[in-house]
């Protein structure tokens, strides 16, 4: 069955958008979920100051009426002006291991951006650099943190198949306190 992309237009749909991540990773011992109320505030134009210079829409991917993916499409006009770019960001992306689903989500963001004059796509990024960014490419068997994005190992493979290339390496380190400080 074909993938249907639905724009989130109601609070109930936004709640489904947020909760999909919890359901999707509920059996994964390494994923640390975001706090639900924090996500509601992040996606709210009334509560997130980034909406003063950003615009965004959220999309759900459905198959047979069941949510199989999600993505946020974001334009940060301040960043685009600063860097002299026309970039649409994709963020909060999650999808089942199906290239049709990931393709539909990314193509939706590209088209959304094109309709608004954007010529490039970049992500995963949030509204600003204060949001979680990047895509895990190794360390899937390590406990994530609330400050980073956790994703399944097939995500980078899907992005590569969609023609995307890594632009930077971001490294997270765990530092242990020694038992004895010399």
Stretches found by the model and what they are:
Residues 47, 74-78:
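Alpha-helical subdomain
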Residues 44-60:
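A short helix-loop-beta-strand connector motif used in the catalytic cores of GNAT acetyltransferases and
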